[in-house]
Amino acid sequence: MLVPELAGQLVCDESSLRWAAEDFGHAVHRRPRAVLRPGGVADVAAIVEFAGKTGLSVAARGSGHSTYGQAQTNGGIVIDMAKLNLVSDVRADRVTAQAGARWSDVLDATLAAGRTPAVLTDYLGTSVGGTLSVGGAGGTSHQHGFQVDSVEELSVVTGTGRLVTCSLRQNRRLFDATRAGLGQCGIIVSATLRVIPAASRVRRYRLQYRDLTTFLAAQHHLINHGKFDFVQGQIFPAAPGVWQYLLEAALYYMPPGTPVDATRIDGQDYGTIADEIDDISYRDFAHRMAPGEAALRDSGEWSYPHAWLTVVLPSAATASLVGEILARLTAAELGQSGLVLLYPIRTDRLHTLLTRSPDSKLAWLFALLRTASVDNPADVAAMIEANRVVHDRAVACGGVTYPINSVPMSAADWRIHFGPRWRQLQAAKEEFDPHGILTPGYGIGTHSAPHCPKPIG
C-alpha cells in the first residue's frame, strides 16, 4: 500500500530508527519501521489512517521523557511531535498549545500576558501532549489537581485518522477517554488550557526536618493552612541509613505586597533543623530545575538510565509504607543523582475520568527517581525489579500507579489500575481505535484486533 502524500517526511534511516527506540529511561528499546516528522496536523491524521489500513501500530513521541518504552512501538510508526509546537491564542483565561510544545514554551507565552498554567510539572521540558496523556502533577496539585484538570478542549486524531475537537460539551466520550488516557483512544495534537493570573515574585521556604513523621505533619498543615501556593517534599540520602527531609513551600505574590517570613508557619513549630528563605521571580521559580539539568548534562548523568517509579498513596498508609521503604532503601539503590519525592494531593481536586486516585480525601504522591549506572545493565534490571515490589506494596495498601513508571505492567495490572473505569476505557478503545493500533508501549491490551502489518509501499 502506498504511503499517503505528506507535507513532512516519513523516514526510515538508521539514525532516526535508533532515536525512536530510545527514551529517558534507556531500559526498553523497541525499534519502529519508520518515523514520521509531520509537516502539520494533517500528516498525523493521514499516517494514522494509513497505519490502520496496513495494520501498523503508531506511537506519538513528545520530548522523549518516558522511562519504559511507553512512546515506542516495535515495527510500527513513531510520530515525532516536536515540530508541532505552536502556542497561540493567549487570553485572560486560556491558551492553546500544540501537543509538541513544551511547558516552558507555554509558560513563556502566558507570562508575556501576565498568566500562567495553574499546574506546572517540575521539569518544564516535558511536552503538553505527553503530560496530558498521563495526568501532569506538580507542587500546586493540592489546590488545582493535575494538568488534565485544566483542559478546556482538545484536538485529537483518533485511531481511524479522524481529526476531532472534543470538550465537556462536544464529543464528551472522546474527551474523557483522551485526558489521562495513555494515548489509547487518540493522539492529542493540540489543547486549550485554563490559565490563571501569574504572580511576579515567589517567597520560597526550604525547611529541613529530622524525621518522616514531622515532615508529613508539616506538609499536611501547610495545605490545610491554605495560603501556600506550592508545597512539595523531597527526601535525600544524608548518610548510610539516614535521610534528609526537605520541604519546599512557596507563596506567590505581586509587589508592593510582601509575604511575612515565618518558619513557625501559622503558629505551628514543626522542629525544623535548618531554614532557608529566599525571594525570586516566578519565572525563575518555575525554571528551578534548569541549573540542575545543566549540571547533569555536563556530567553526562542526564543520559544515564532512569528507572523511575511514582505511585499515589492513601494518607492512612503513607507513613508506614514510606517508612518501611526508606528503611530498606540505600543510596546506591537510588543512584548518584536519584531522589525521592513525597507531597500531598487533595483527591477532590482530581476531576478527570481516567485519573486514578486512592479512596482517601488526602493522598500522597510518592516517587522513587532512580538513576542507574551507565556501565552496568544489571543495575537497571535490579532497580526495575525493586520498583515492581514497591508498586505491588502500594497497590496492596490502596494506592494507585501514576502511569509513567519503569515497571513491567500486564493487561491484568491495567485492569486493576483502572478498576471501575476499565469497561469505559475498553468501550472507548473499540469505538475510537477499532484497529487497535495506538500507543502499544503500555501493554494495556484493551483490544483484541489482530495486527498483520502490510508492506509499506
Give each language-model segment a name:
Residues 2-20:
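Conserved oxyanion/phosphate-binding beta-strand-loop segments in alpha/beta enzyme cores
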Residues 15-122, 135-140:
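Glycine-rich N-terminal segment of FAD-binding domains in flavoprotein oxidoreductases
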Residues 43-46, 105, 214-216, 255-266, ...:
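Short, conserved charged micro-motifs
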Residues 116, 144-149:
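Short loop/turn motifs at secondary-structure junctions and domain boundaries
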Residues 152-320, 336:
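C-terminal substrate-binding/cap subdomain adjacent to the FAD-binding core in PCMH-type
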Residues 294-297, 307, 395-457:
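Activity-critical C-terminal alpha-helical subdomain
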Residues 301-408, 414-418:
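Substrate-recognition/cap regions that form aromatic- and gly/pro-loop-enriched pockets
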